[in-house]
């Protein structure tokens, strides 16, 4: 917020001394229409599916142990079991319970790690995309003679005439009428 106020103060001060060219851009719309957006989204989806398969494998391991435990419980109900056989079954049940607790703990930690890895990947992909967009915006601003181009979401109000999003979409090779996410949130 302090940066926004400082930027606004700078704009006001500079506007008083000279005519400035200012523009706004919808950065999220540009991200959704960046050439890498679909491949990044596909990578995130496939990575998520890989993580889900890994977690399903751990869950299947736990399910198998639970079935073994159920069979042992059925044996425990047999009135014909000797005391030694009953003790052996109880020992096996205890071992299965310990293994199940280990699997449950492994599942939780693996799920957390997968979720964190996915968030990290998403963050890296978004940073790469926004860095590229910032470079493209700098080139666009330089060519167009703009003094400032602000993200429309960081400015409380701007006239529609300042919006250069359509020009940036064209620079990305996207027809503004076909832009993904144009009407989302409206």
Segments from the language model and where they lie:
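Positively charged n-region of N-terminal signal peptides that target proteins for export
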Residues: 1-4
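Amphipathic, charged alpha-helical segments and their helix-to-coil junctions
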Residues: 19-186
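Hydrophobic h-region of N-terminal signal peptides that target proteins for export
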Residues: 6-17
């Amino acid at each position: 917020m302090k940066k926004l106020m400082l930027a606004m103060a700078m704009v006001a001060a500079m506007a008083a001394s000279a005519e400035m060219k200012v523009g706004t851009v919808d950065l999220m719309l540009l991200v959704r229409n960046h050439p890498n957006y679909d491949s990044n989204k596909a990578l995130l989806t496939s990575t998520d599916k890989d993580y889900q398969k890994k977690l399903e494998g751990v869950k299947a391991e736990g399910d198998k142990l639970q079935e073994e435990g159920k069979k042992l419980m059925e044996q425990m109900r047999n009135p014909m079991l000797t005391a030694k056989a009953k003790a052996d079954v109880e020992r096996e049940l205890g071992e299965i319970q310990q293994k199940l607790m280990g699997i449950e703990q492994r599942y939780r930690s693996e799920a957390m790690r997968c979720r964190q890895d996915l968030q990290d990947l998403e963050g890296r992909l978004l940073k790469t995309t926004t860095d590229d967009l910032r470079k493209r915006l700098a080139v666009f601003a330089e060519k167009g003679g703009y003094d400032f181009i602000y993200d429309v979401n960081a400015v409380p109000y701007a006239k529609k005439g300042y919006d250069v999003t359509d020009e940036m979409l064209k620079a990305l090779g996207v027809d503004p009428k076909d832009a993904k996410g144009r009407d989302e949130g409206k």
